[in-house]
């Protein structure tokens, strides 16, 4: 054996002996365990770092995503608000456009513009002179020429009175200064004077017949017309029903005076109607229409021609002799020159006509100074006087003489009112119908 082999054997033996008797672990084993432990530690640390990094990334991403979501919500909310604002502005602009589209163009000087464009409509403003309008329009304003001439004449000016009560607001107005019924060119607008018809009535057998007959005549008269019915001693249901069913604008008054004198009762009824006109200052033509008279509808159209006082003839049926007497004016044109009269001898009447033979302007009652009335006392009907003196005294308070009267009915040649004495003065039972005592009972009641 060589020295090299012996040395090798000696090293192996020494190594085996060292390894057999050395209590410490093998250095190769220790290195592998520490490496594994270190590697596990590093792995756990790396995994922990990854977990921490992933959680931080997740939280950061969540924060970023939540911020983005919040910003998107705010952005969507702002977009919604702006959209609503835009829609509201669009709606407002649309409504304003519709309002402007339906509003007709106008100017501040509206009356002057209308008067300049349409000569048929007169205005009494300071900027428009009536005479200049008539000269500029020529024949187009023929209906208003009479009005302008009457205003320039010496006749008293009829100013605008207080407003008519609410019960008359729905009625058509009329031109006071114009004495005729006229139409405004071809527009179809007809201006008529207001008629105020006064009728006295009382409960009696033929009351319904007379009122219905007069109501049918008045219903055929074109409006405006007011029917004032004064009743005594109370407002009966039958009369109220007749007035309601007539289709005419009416006033139902009463005279509750405690008397049995027929003349005083009629005077009370007429004065109550006059006081009603004075109180409300009704403007129109007044006529006392007796319910027992027979009227032609043409008479009421003739009344609208009256400026101050108008009169016409009345035919009176005298008793059972089948004779007719004419009572009323004698005219030359429309000027009253004399009278047809049936008055008795010894009775002198200044104006020999009855209440059914004249009509007058109502402004004489509540403003007589406009017409230079001959009397300053209150214009009422007095109960004194017989044989037509009552009517004559009432007319004397309205006019001075025949020059202030106007004759109607084709120069006072037409008869439009008839007075027929049809109703008996008193309705009684025939003789023998009224028993003074009761009959004796044939079968007594036990």
Curated annotation (Swiss-Prot):
Keyword list, A-Z: Cell wall biogenesis/degradation, Glycoprotein, Glycosyltransferase, Golgi apparatus, Membrane, Signal-anchor, Transferase, Transmembrane, Transmembrane helix
Name listed for the protein in its UniProt record: Probable beta-1,4-xylosyltransferase IRX9L
Ranges annotated as spanning the membrane: 86-106
Homology family: Belongs to the glycosyltransferase 43 family.
Annotated organism of origin: Oryza sativa subsp. japonica
Cysteines joined through disulfide linkages: none
Glycosylated sites: 185, 258, 361, 411
Cytoplasmic side: 1-85
């Amino acid at each position: 054996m060589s020295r090299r082999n012996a040395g090798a054997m000696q090293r192996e033996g020494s190594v085996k002996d060292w390894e057999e008797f050395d209590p410490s672990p093998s250095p190769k084993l220790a290195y592998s365990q520490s490496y594994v432990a270190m590697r596990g530690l590093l792995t756990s640390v790396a995994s922990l770092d990854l977990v921490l990094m992933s959680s931080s990334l997740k939280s950061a991403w969540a924060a970023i995503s939540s911020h983005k979501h919040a910003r998107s919500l705010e952005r969507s909310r702002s977009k919604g608000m702006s959209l609503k604002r835009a829609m509201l502005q669009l709606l407002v602009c649309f409504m304003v456009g519709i309002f402007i589209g339906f509003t007709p163009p106008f100017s501040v000087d509206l009356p002057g513009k209308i008067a300049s464009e349409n000569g048929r409509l007169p205005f009494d403003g300071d900027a428009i002179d009536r005479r200049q309008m008539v000269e500029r329009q020529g024949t187009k304003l023929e209906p208003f020429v009479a009005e302008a001439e009457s205003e320039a004449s010496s006749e008293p000016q009829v100013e605008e009175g207080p407003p008519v009560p609410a019960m008359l607001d729905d009625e058509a107005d009329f031109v006071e200064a114009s004495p005729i019924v006229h139409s405004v060119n071809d527009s179809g607008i007809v201006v008529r004077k207001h008629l105020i018809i006064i009728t006295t009535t009382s409960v009696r057998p033929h009351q319904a017949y007379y009122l219905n007959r007069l109501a049918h005549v008045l219903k055929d008269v074109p409006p405006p017309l007011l029917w004032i019915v004064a009743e005594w001693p109370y407002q009966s249901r039958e009369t109220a029903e007749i007035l309601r069913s007539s289709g005419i604008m009416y006033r139902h008054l009463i005279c509750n005076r405690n008397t049995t004198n027929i003349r005083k009762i009629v005077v009370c009824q007429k004065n109550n109607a006059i006081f009603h006109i004075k109180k409300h200052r009704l403007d129109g033509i007044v006529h006392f229409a007796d319910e027992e008279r027979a009227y032609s509808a043409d008479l009421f159209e003739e009344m609208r021609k009256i400026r101050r006082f108008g009169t016409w003839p009345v035919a009176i049926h005298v008793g059972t002799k089948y004779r007719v007497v004419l009572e009323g004016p004698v005219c030359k044109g429309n000027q009253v020159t004399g009278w047809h009269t049936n008055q008795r001898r010894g009775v002198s009447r200044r104006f020999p006509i009855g209440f059914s033979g004249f009509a007058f302007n109502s402004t004489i009652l509540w403003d007589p100074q406009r017409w230079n009335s001959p009397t300053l006392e209150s214009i009422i009907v007095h109960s004194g006087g017989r044989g037509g003196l009552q009517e004559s005294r009432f007319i004397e308070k309205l006019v001075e003489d025949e020059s202030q009267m106007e004759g109607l009915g084709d120069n006072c040649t037409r008869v439009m009112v008839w007075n027929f004495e049809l109703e008996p003065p008193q309705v009684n039972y025939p003789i023998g119908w009224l028993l003074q005592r009761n009959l004796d009972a044939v079968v007594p009641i036990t």
